[in-house]
Amino acid sequence: MQPCLVKIRRIRSGSDLPLPRYMTPHAAGMDLCADVDADLVLEPGERALVPTGIAIALPDGFEAQIRPRSGLALKHGIALVNSPGTIDPDYRGEIGVIIVNHGADAFVVRRGERIAQMVFAPFVRAELLDVDELDETARGDGGFGHTGR
């Protein structure tokens, strides 16, 4: 496992909120909490940017992926609009979570509620080579379910 030392800074009123943390010894993602001043009511079909009150500094070659929490999706229909969201290593602003309510009922985001998870991953930067043709493969250009069920 490659080490990844991440610097974190509280940038809002979140000193009463826990820093992101792993909830089990083998969890891949750290839970992020909502740093809202008042309850945020999300009606069915609505979306909102939920502040977390934190900013991070990642080492070069790493990204942070913001992902949904499965329990919120299953129980309430809460999802992330851009999943996963990507935090680049040069971004220093507050991490925000864009959520949408796909459920049938209003959903209330309360201060300190765990709303998403953050997974750290190394990445590579590709170099593109402009060519006239691509190598042939058995699959070819088949996509979008062409292999059946």
From Swiss-Prot:
Keyword Transmembrane among UniProt keywords: no
Gene3D superfamilies: 2.70.40.10
E.C. number(s) listed in UniProt: 3.6.1.23
Keywords: Hydrolase, Magnesium, Metal-binding, Nucleotide metabolism
Catalysed reactions, as listed in the record: dUTP + H2O = dUMP + diphosphate + H(+)
Names of the cofactor(s): Mg(2+)
Domain of life where this protein originates: Bacteria
Cited InterPro entries: dUTPase, dUTPase-like, dUTPase-like_sf, dUTPase_trimeric
Residues annotated to bind substrate: R69, S70, G71, N82, T86, I87, D88
Gene Ontology BP, a term: dUMP biosynthetic process
Enzyme class per UniProt: hydrolase
GO molecular function: dUTP diphosphatase activity; magnesium ion binding
Pathway noted in the entry: Pyrimidine metabolism; dUMP biosynthesis; dUMP from dCTP (dUTP route): step 2/2
Function: This enzyme is involved in nucleotide metabolism: it produces dUMP, the immediate precursor of thymidine nucleotides and it decreases the intracellular concentration of dUTP so that uracil cannot be incorporated into DNA.
Family: Belongs to the dUTPase family.
HAMAP family: dUTPase_bact
Name of this protein: Deoxyuridine 5'-triphosphate nucleotidohydrolase
Upper lineage: Bacteria, Pseudomonadati, Thermodesulfobacteriota, Desulfuromonadia, Geobacterales
